[in-house]
From Swiss-Prot:
InterPro entries: Ig-like_dom (IPR007110), Ig-like_dom_sf (IPR036179), Ig-like_fold (IPR013783), Ig_sub (IPR003599), Ig_V-set (IPR013106), TCR_beta_variable (IPR050413). This is T-cell receptor beta chain V region 3H.25. One of its GO terms (cellular component) is plasma membrane. Residues 119-135 are annotated as: J segment. Residues 1-20 form the signal peptide.
Amino acid sequence: MATRLLCYTVLCLLGARILNSKVIQTPRYLVKGQGQKAKMRCIPEKGHPVVFWYQQNKNNEFKFLINFQNQEVLQQIDMTEKRFSAECPSNSPCSLEIQSSEAGDSALYLCASSLFGTSDYTFGSGTRLLVIGKA
């Protein structure tokens, strides 16, 4: 009984952290057919000029995709054969877009923001992308 109560308490606290996240990601879930475009958005914490996008696969491995500072790209990977694109315009949500989704793109996509880009990252709740069948 005590173990069950502890589990419920932890789940409630984790849920509260997600609900109170200062980084807002939409949509929470995204289901696309192969070949379809997938777009996710992120509103960074107010006053945070540095924004990161990560991909977390089914093995819980994190892959850095891109980061911005004041709307300018600082670092990025090859953006997966140019199928991925991202932008972070001033006064608008940042976005990550996959032009032609593939099954291997199914993952949790996380946006994080930071004041300086070196520590104290604030993560959003993520967008879970599932790519199925044919478009």
